């Protein structure tokens, strides 16, 4: 199940990339395409995401819930 999260001060959607099933952070606003490690993944001009595999452990630890609480990413990924 997708989850709305905060990463690097931006609201993104934690999900799995539709083509490969890889976990990623999907944009919620077209202005987010300039974020570090954001990649164009095809389709309409708004299909961009950050693949979690491209983030360091420190960067992954910065992904929080909307209320700022740290997430257990292993558990979150299991539930996706």
Residue ranges: model-predicted function:
Residues 14-66:
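Acidic, low-complexity, intrinsically disordered interaction modules
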Residues 12-14, 71:
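Short, isolated positions in well-ordered beta-strands
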Residues 1-2, 77-80:
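Short intrinsically disordered terminal tails
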Residues 69-77:
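Charged low-complexity stretches with an acidic bias
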Residues 1, 35-38, 73:
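Detector for methionine-enriched segments
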């Amino acid at each position: 199940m997708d989850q709305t999260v905060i990463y690097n001060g931006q609201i993104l959607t934690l999900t799995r990339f539709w083509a490969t099933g890889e976990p990623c952070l999907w944009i919620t606003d077209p202005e987010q395409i300039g974020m570090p490690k954001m990649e164009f993944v095809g389709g309409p001009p708004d299909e961009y995401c950050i693949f979690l595999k491209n983030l360091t452990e420190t960067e992954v630890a910065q992904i929080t819930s909307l209320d700022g609480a740290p997430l257990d990413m292993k558990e979150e990924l299991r539930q996706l």
